[in-house]
């Protein structure tokens, strides 16, 4: 069973390190998982943080928009790339608890 988590991101650079810690902690119990970040035209360093993360850990993938298309467009692109048996969406600002 593979889990895909699709997360749209727009200017969430401050939240991303904490989000990664929580995702790693909660997903480590599963043998197969991926996290797909869709950067929706961020200008605060989110794109660079996510690119570095994806280069270091193959569980993480990045789709980059060069301007803000909105949450629906971001989710749609994430769904196209997701190949898990289960697909979960969440926000990058930690309003959704990764443990849930």
Could you tell me what each predicted segment is?
Residues 1-100:
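Structured catalytic core of nucleotide-sugar glycosyltransferases
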């Amino acid at each position: 069973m593979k889990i895909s988590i699709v997360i749209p991101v727009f200017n969430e650079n401050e939240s991303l390190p904490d989000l990664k810690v929580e995702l790693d902690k909660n997903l480590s119990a599963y043998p197969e998982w991926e996290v797909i970040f869709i950067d929706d035209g961020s200008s605060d360093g989110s794109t660079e943080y996510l690119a570095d993360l994806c280069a270091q850990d193959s569980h993480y993938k990045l789709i980059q928009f060069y301007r803000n298309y909105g949450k629906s467009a971001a989710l749609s692109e994430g769904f196209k790339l997701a190949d898990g048996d289960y697909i979960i969406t969440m926000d990058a600002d930690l309003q959704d608890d990764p443990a849930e």
